[in-house]
C-alpha cells in the first residue's frame, strides 16, 4: 500500500515539474480531463497549473440532436428516421452512447441487407445500448419463462401506474448477455436536473415490482430480484444518509463518499458514527423498503388482470412494445 502511495505521489510530482519546470515555456497550453476531480492532488489544481476548469455534463436534448447529426453524416438514413424524436427519447445518454446507438443501428441494417437505417433499426439498437445484447440462443424452460414474464410484468405495471417513473419502452423475457432473464426498459421523456423524494420512493417501488409479482402468483420466490433489491437498498440508503430525507435521522450526511478505494488512498474504510446511529440508519432503510414493498403489492394486486394479460402476451411474443403494453390498460378500461 505504501508503495502504491509512493508511486502515486511520484507521478504527481513528475506532472508538476513537466507543467511548470524550472523555466517558462511560452505558447504551451496543458489540457487534461478526469471524471474524478474530487481525488486530485490540490497542488495539481492550484492557479498557474490549471487555471480554468470546465465541467462537461451529459448533453441536453438540443445537444443530443446535434451529436446525432454529426454521427449520422456518414450513415444513410431512411425517410422515417427522426433525429429530433430520437434526441427526445435518449435522456441521460452521453455522446459516446449516441454514437454507439447509430453504429448499432447501422449493423442491424447491414444484417438485413439494407443500404440505409430505418427507425425500427434504431429502436432495436436502443435496447442493446441501454440493456445489452439479447441472447436468443439461450434455452430456458417454460417454467422459467413464466416466472420471468410475471417478474417483468410486475415492473412494467408500476412503471405505467406511478406518475414520475414511466413510461415503458419495451418489456422482454429474452435473456441478455449481462445474465438477466429478461428486462423492462423505461423511456425517459425529459432531462432531470435533480431527483425528488417522491420520485425516489417510486423508483424503489418499481425495483420491488418483480419480487412482488412472484410473491402474489407463485408459492416460492427466486433469486431473480437480487439486482433489483440491491438497487432499491442503495437508493434507500442514499435517501437516509446522503440526501437528508429521513425525519428520524435528520439533515445530516452520513454517506462515506470519500472512503472509496482508489490508488494512493487508504484501503481501510472508517465510519464516522457509532452503532446507535448505524442501527437507526438500518431501521430507516428497512422502513422505506417495507413501505415501498407494500405499495407495490397494493398496485399490482389491483391490476391483476393486466398482469395476467401481459404475461400471456409475453409468452406468445417474448418481447412487446410500449404501444402493445399500454393497449392492455386501454382494453381494461373498456371492460
Mark where each language-model region is:
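Substrate-engagement module of ASCE P-loop NTPases
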Residues: 11-27
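Residue-level signature of catalytic and energy-coupling elements of molecular machines
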Residues: 15, 34, 50, 64, ...
